[in-house]
Amino acid sequence: MFINGFVNYPVRTPPNDLLQVVLHGFLRCPLDGSQVDSIGIGHTVHGIVLPGKWVVLMCVLSFLEPPSRRYTFCEADLPYTKITARKAERPSQGGKDYNGTAKSAQSTTV
């Protein structure tokens, strides 16, 4: 079961910075729908989510971000369930949980 959803990441990202996406599924290119990267749970993704760019998230996910980052969840025309993000104070410490918009979802089996 995969859930359709969108997330906007409109901040400046240093070239060597990492965004760790904790999910099981894949990301699709927002322009032509081609698969950008296939990842498993806990993998660190390089250069997938770029400043001010849209990506399509084909499942429920979590983020782990440095405290200097900000993220914005945006509602789109596809239904999605609650998207949960965690902003980490330090890599060795737990962070606060931030919840995105919750909607009733329509899921499709892939």
Swiss-Prot record:
It comes from the Eukaryota. Residues 101-110 have a biased composition (Polar residues). Residues 85-110 are annotated as: Disordered. Partially overlaps CDC15. This is Putative uncharacterized protein YAR019W-A. It comes from Saccharomyces cerevisiae (strain ATCC 204508 / S288c).
